[in-house]
Amino acid sequence: MNTKLNIIKALGILAIVAAAFSSSAQQDPMYTQYMFNTQTINPAYAGTWESLGFMVLGRNQWSGFDGAPNTYTFTMQAPLRNERVALGLNVISDKIGYEKRFYVYGDYSYLVPVGEKTNLRLGLKGGFTNYSHNLEEHNILDPNDPAFIGEITHSFKPNFGVGAFLYSKKAYVGFSIPKVINSNFDITSENFSIEGELRHYFLMAGAVFDLGENLKFKPTAFTKASFTSESGTPVQFDFTGNFLFKEKLWLGAMYRTGDSFGFIAQFLFAEKLRVGYAIDFSTTNLRHYNNGTHEVMISYELKFRKEEVVSPRYF
């Protein structure tokens, strides 16, 4: 019985890793609350808060399944004395099975006013990804399998990205390529190899509509595309609808094509502190083997300007 369970466990982890690195959907960490975490994929988003801001996010994908992806994210953005310039920082730890990726990227964003109430930000992102894989941690049936003989392997890959973000108080459109350079991690053994980073194109849009004195509706759409031969899913779409009650409570739902659906809740404290929770449920065969995906986000803003804030940020 134990041997059978070990085989099932090993096959399960192998299936997760294979799916994660053979399809475009998992080449970079995915987020359900992407509309408040845009900076990780679009450097032009830095500066849109118009204040010093911090965000932390933890995502436990396919909860209850050994070796499933776990992602921890920290971002910050800060305007400079030159009000048109803002800087950002993104630090991400992503683990799938025995494989780990650690991302550190800095952002530069420049503001171009295009109208009385509309702004365009252009951004540049630069940094690196460090990949590591500890072959000795594998619980395998054959300890002499040459594919799993070795110690910790590492690979370091620098990269850069570009982005644009057009926005007003209640609407936005963004486009970005967070990693321009296609690269491989060049970690291979007799029976297994790891793909590196593929170039992805992101297009996003959202708007806020007043439905009443204390009720607003925000639909958003998010598209991720990769046109390389290595990508298993060339195009993926996210659709989200959120309702805002009394400028404090967000409640909504999301759908990701070919992957999952879920629900989102966020609460705003004093317009500076935002706490959000999201849960996803897989629509693939993996739904039978996990308890959903859980995501918690906390963001905080330090506002130094004296003018009164009329309403909170909508994205």
Language-model regions, residue ranges each:
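Subset of outer-membrane beta-barrel
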Residues: Q26-F315
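Bacterial N-terminal signal peptides
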Residues: A10-A20
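Bacterial N-terminal signal peptides that target proteins for export
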Residues: M1-G12
